Amino acid sequence: MLVKTRGVILKEIKFRDQSKICPVFTEHFGKISVILKGVRNPKNKLSGVFSTGNMVELVIYKKQNRDLHLVSDALLLQSPMSARPDMERFTTIYQLIETLKQVTGSEEPHPVLFRFLAATIEELCKPERDYQLVLAWFLIRLVTVLGFEPELEQCVISGEPLIPAAEAMAPDENLYFLFDPGGIAFAGPSALIRSEKRALPALSFRLLRWLSRQNIDALPDIRIPEEHPRRLCELLQDYCAVHIDHNPPVRNRRIISQIRPDNT
């Protein structure tokens, strides 16, 4: 059956002399693998279209009970890696793709998640953005769509409202993010829990809650020290990892930390 859908390229795998295989997270079919015959020939019209991180519209011959589907045609929609070189953008896209590869199962459609992903890719194509802030915006929606949205309104242990107390706290005064049950707790009650938890400065918490309630087009209006979006990205990636059947990609995290601009 010939079908059309949008998708984000998760990986490129060389196949034989001129072809390649790509896992793609698609709008209508979830994660599938496609084969592009002869695409590594520079004269092929699809050469360069199926690069990791690209958003494409693709036409495929999709067959039931097959793990590999042949691409008939494709159109490049967005290419965040082809924009002006930016190391922070590169590392953010790498984090995004690695997270998607972990949490998406084969042929499990997530149309709502794809809509958030499409908005994120579009924002990552723009210059002079806080790319880690964009990723944090996506990750809080990812965990919500996957069914383990953290509690951000009241302490997950005591039930006490978080907002009045958090707004009165100094920016570097800590709350705690508990992985199980997922959500925020005050320092006192969190001491009773033995499951994994992370200290979270009050300002980082307020940012997390703000991100959970805002459209992506509000992000350029906020100015906040870069360590807070970065902290949220690391926290939410780890939170994802403990709620799925995969182990955290420790090696990949080390690579990211080594290539960040502030480590060069």
From Swiss-Prot:
Any single Gene Ontology cellular-component annotation: bacterial nucleoid
Keyword Transmembrane attributed: no
UniProt key word DNA damage: yes
A Pfam family reported for this protein in Swiss-Prot or TrEMBL: RecO_N
SUPFAM superfamilies in the cross-refs: ArfGap/RecO-like zinc finger, Nucleic acid-binding proteins
InterPro entries noted in UniProt: ARFGAP/RecO, DNA_rep/recomb_RecO_N, NA-bd_OB-fold, RecO, RecO_C
Entry's Gene Ontology BP terms: DNA recombination; double-strand break repair
Organism domain of life: Bacteria
Coiled coil, from the record: none
UniProt keyword list: DNA damage, DNA recombination, DNA repair
Family label: Belongs to the RecO family.
HAMAP family for the chain: RecO
Role this protein plays: Involved in DNA repair and RecF pathway recombination.
Name the record gives this protein: DNA repair protein RecO
Native source organism of the sequence: Prosthecochloris aestuarii (strain DSM 271 / SK 413)
Source species taxonomy: Bacteria, Pseudomonadati, Chlorobiota, Chlorobiia, Chlorobiales
